């Protein structure tokens, strides 16, 4: 079981924090004014670009998951030190799982955003994917936490509060269609993987549904990049796209290693 320091808030699931390093050299920023993520998730890609280039670009981060957007809005205006302080608990003070569950319920009773952060950031989930509708809360055990604000969390808060960062909660197609006709736009697609069973994703964001109308996307003016797992289904769909390169990716929880392909449209 985990012990020691657990950094709450801004935990990049799936090694997203480091993944940008693996594909950033494939992305060209010539004449680009706007960075768009239709599936922003934790917005780590836009964040890493911002860390490197600052407010040189506008950043449009979009996700249909309302919890994520609430999380961003909460994170923008919260004193992180005070917030994290209230969750620093010593497991030894709670000698049964019942007591920890009661504590969890007290935290979550009024604050949906707190509930999301606690479930995602303060609990040990093993290899289970977190379900949106939690019925048996005892599945998720709160362990000893000695959390503290780290430099990435403070920097991410600065990113969210930049006047060049715009947050939206729309369907990915609506987001994409708004920006597809301008060659000053760089659109980075990092959608849920085809074989993902993570029910946190909306139904229309899972499976091959998300890759509809790809031939049209391939011909639009905006520069579009897809970061996708190397599987036969996506290779067939993207056979007319430019392949810029590949890189290995190891998932932090399962230690499963896969190959990812960076695709770019023919614009």
Residues covered by each model-derived region:
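SAM cofactor-binding core of SAM-dependent methyltransferases
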Residues: 33-100
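Active-site flanking residues adjacent to catalytic metal/cofactor-binding acidic residues
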Residues: 36, 62, 170, 189, ...
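Short, polar loop motifs at secondary-structure junctions
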Residues: 41-42, 151-155, 228-233
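Short helix-loop-beta connector
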Residues: 28-34, 181-183
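Conserved beta-strand segments of alpha/beta enzyme cores
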Residues: 58, 164-166, 242
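Long, positively charged, glycine-interspersed low-complexity recognition regions
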Residues: 201-267
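Short catalytic/ligand-binding loop motif for oxyanion handling, primarily in non-cytosolic enzymes
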Residues: 44-47, 68-70, 125-128, 195-198, ...
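SAM-dependent nucleic-acid methyltransferase catalytic core
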Residues: 2-22, 80-188, 192-198
């Amino acid at each position: 079981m985990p012990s020691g320091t657990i950094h709450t808030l801004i935990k990049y699931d799936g090694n997203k924090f480091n993944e940008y390093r693996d594909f950033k050299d494939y992305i060209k920023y010539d004449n680009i004014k706007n960075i768009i993520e239709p599936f922003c998730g934790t917005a780590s890609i836009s964040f890493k670009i911002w860390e490197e280039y600052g407010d040189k670009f506008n950043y449009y981060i979009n996700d249909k998951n309302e919890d994520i957007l609430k999380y961003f809005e909460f994170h923008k205006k919260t004193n992180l030190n005070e917030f994290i302080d209230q969750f620093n608990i010593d497991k030894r003070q709670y000698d049964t799982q019942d007591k920890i569950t009661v504590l969890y319920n007290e935290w979550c009773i009024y604050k949906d955003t707190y509930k999301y952060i606690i479930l995602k950031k303060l609990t040990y989930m093993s290899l289970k994917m977190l379900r949106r509708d939690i019925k048996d809360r005892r599945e998720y055990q709160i362990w000893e936490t000695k959390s503290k604000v780290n430099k990435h969390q403070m920097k991410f808060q600065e990113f969210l509060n930049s006047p060049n960062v715009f947050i939206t909660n729309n369907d990915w197609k609506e987001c994409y269609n708004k920006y597809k006709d301008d060659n000053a736009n760089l659109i980075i697609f990092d959608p849920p993987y085809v074989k993902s069973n993570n029910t946190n994703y909306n139904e229309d964001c899972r499976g091959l549904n998300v890759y509809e109308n790809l031939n049209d996307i391939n011909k639009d003016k905006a520069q579009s990049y897809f970061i996708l797992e190397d599987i036969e289904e996506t290779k067939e769909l993207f056979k007319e796209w430019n392949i810029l390169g590949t890189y290995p990716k190891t998932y932090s929880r399962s230690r499963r290693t896969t190959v990812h392909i960076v695709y770019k449209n023919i614009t």
